[in-house]
């Protein structure tokens, strides 16, 4: 063991550290779609790209550009796969852990998570005194989760996930 280590995808603290990594490769590039750390409550996804499996990865931004809620369409990407027999069709599979909380604005709990992990002890203490019953998820019934499957769209290296009320695999080359 040596003192050497490498950092491939650094972020500061929750909710900005990343989880739920969905890796896929396309045209020689490696992609990661990740989620912030806000429990079962959704948050903006982030797409990153690298030339090799081990990076370094370059963050490209939120693939859900048209999602005004900043919640990845109220879901968390868990997997991406290329559809066999299709020219360039990739599908993102996402979990919608809390369909009962879709009306809860992201800004409400984003601020709480930022304060919860603040370097300022007064901010952390203020969160401990808050009534967090509206966002608490330790008793969430994830058996009620549902799913979102959407096709990916590519522009250069950037990946986009657009909302579609319905779509068919047959509509893609």
Where are these regions (language model features)?
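Carbohydrate-active catalytic/glycan-binding domains of CAZyme proteins
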Residues: 1-173
